[in-house]
Amino acid sequence: MLRRLRLPVILATAALLAGLLASPLKAAIWPEQWWSFKRTSLEKLTPGDQGVWQEYGLKEAERATYEDGALKFTATGWRVNDTTAALAVFQWQRPQGWKKSSLSELALENGPNAYFTFGNYVIRLEGYIPDEEKRQILFVQLPRLERGPLPTLPGHLPAAGLDANSERYILGPASLEHFEPRLPPSAAAFHMGAEAQIAQYESPKGPVTLALFSYPTPAMAKKQVLEFGKLSGVLVKRTGPMIAVVVGGQDADFSERLLAQVNYRAQVSWDEQTKPVEPNMGDVILTAFKFAGLLMVVTLLVGAMMAGVRFFGRRYLGWEKEGEALLTLHLDDRR
């Protein structure tokens, strides 16, 4: 009996495995249908530099091909932790020579190609750029979308002398070691909530790296600036909760001028107290009359409904008319 059952079980298991292998790959980012375009291929991506990607919180990476008649384009997407990580990936993976675009707050274009961020997604389109309406159709389908403000640290980089596409956003020891190994993670103290923005500058005597480290409070920055000051070959400055570090500067004057351009600008917002609106007595009286009138209408409607029910019951259902109950106090009996 067991021998008879063995062959069917083996065949069923083989069929199940074959079905699983033959089943189409399930997409984690790109939908099957995008407007009039149909997805014709899907590829899961496994990027290198796993330590950096893990620090940026990479969740999914996919490349898909879409077609609509003769029109065909390729879409690559990365989903990471949040908008800060999306900024870091955008700076790291951006193509060289592309121009700024208005597709989003962080966007580049090059002919029919686009590269931009949307929330915690980084998207690259090659061969066709859908219009705003079609892009919105994609955005509402993106799973686990998270929106938030971009970090303000990149805005503190001096513009003069900045090498294009040299910016790299640092979220921890792995990305710091990958992009600027001359600065030790122990000096940065990422466990205190630090983030950093680094960039390259051209001086008359060679390239210079500027690293801006941001901390939750000025007190933390004041403590860590002492650690950076212990390093050799660097020039350090603290401004507010931010530390500026120049690395590899062979031109001392250029390094000093570069540091002088870095100044923390606090962004403070508050709600102004507004004078309470005094009620208009005419409106108050009018509202009271409206409410009283509404109560009268409701009372009349309820009374008419009850009278209608009693009339219908007596006329068609044979309800007997009950005598009116009379309450007697019998006060004369107590005399």
What are these regions (language model features)?
Residues 1-6:
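N-terminal secretory signal peptides that target proteins for export/translocation
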Residues 8-20:
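Bacterial N-terminal signal peptides
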Residues 19-209, 213-335:
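Soluble, non-membrane globular domain cores that form compact, hydrophobic packing
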